[in-house]
Amino acid sequence: NHTNLNYKHLVVTGIGGTLERINGYLEKAKSQKDKEFYTGCRIVMEAVSDYIFRYAKKTAEKAEQTEDPVRRSELGQMAVVMEKIATQKPETFTEAIELVWMIQLIGNLFGGSALSLSRFDQYMFPFYKHDIERGILTVDRAFELICSLYLKLNEPKMRTVQSLAVGGVRCENGENACNDLSKLCLEAMSALKTPYPNMSARVMPGKTQDWFYEEIMRTVKAGCGQPMILNDAVWIPNLTSLGIPEKWARDYYNMGCTEIMIQGKDCNWTTGGLIFFPQLCNALVHMSVAKNKTYENFDAFLNEYLQLVSAQCDEAGESGKNVIHSQRERNCDPFASSLIDGCLENALD
């Protein structure tokens, strides 16, 4: 649930690079527990590679069966791309976005209740810039691919919320991070008006340029209810106040709905601890009526209500801790462990 898929790292290393890291750690593993951990990660990532390769094979078969020359060419190119990314790192924008989609799909198959493409415009921009400068990608084609990705995210196979963040600041130096791809992502949302991705636009007063604010307003005016606007001047200090390094805090994004995570750094989340505040108020009213209890003023009622809320929060917190401890003892997620920073390095699920 809320699996942090760390695309920022994945598009650089690819599936093959991830497997190389796992095998390297496996060769050096000393304890049986560590060997089992790395073996599990290797099995899963090999399965990921095989899964993508099966798509490549099926797409090639469809290409042979297709009479329309344009569609046959498209399917043939898709097959070539997927066969490559099944084992090698992506080198073009088309290859990178295909890898992102396949991993997002696999994340849903693994039971991801809420997933995110995180800071898509940041980790995809080097591929976009490279291809545009060399004339192997047009802006229109990039826009079409982004729109296609958005449409795929809205297919029934996707379990729940799929999110994406654009804009913000660079994690290295805190400078403005908005780029041409940030603009295209917003334009795609304005054109399609789809529920997903649940998009956020990050802004930093004094750093974010006027053109990005204008693009945000254009998207809002399109009537699609997107994007949510996140203020870096608020969120980054909030995160650093929790002890998170500023460089990491600058790399935050909205996971699923509005949950804030750090790209590549957070572990999976559990769903629980839901507190229905109106229901608590209603329960207090019914209890007061049943006991024929009255209050001198509203503040007295509010004080008792807040005590009830506090007790429920404590109970929810303890319940959440029990769930987390139970998961640690009974479950493991080698897929997420292969992608989240620190897991492979420390042989920790």
Which sequence ranges carry the predicted segments?
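Conserved catalytic cores of very large enzyme subunits
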Residues: 1-40, 70-88, 92-349
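Amphipathic, well-ordered alpha-helical segments in soluble domains
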Residues: 25, 51-58, 123
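Extended non-globular scaffold/tether segments
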Residues: 39-50
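A conserved hydrophobic secondary-structure block that centers on an alpha-helix together
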Residues: 63-70
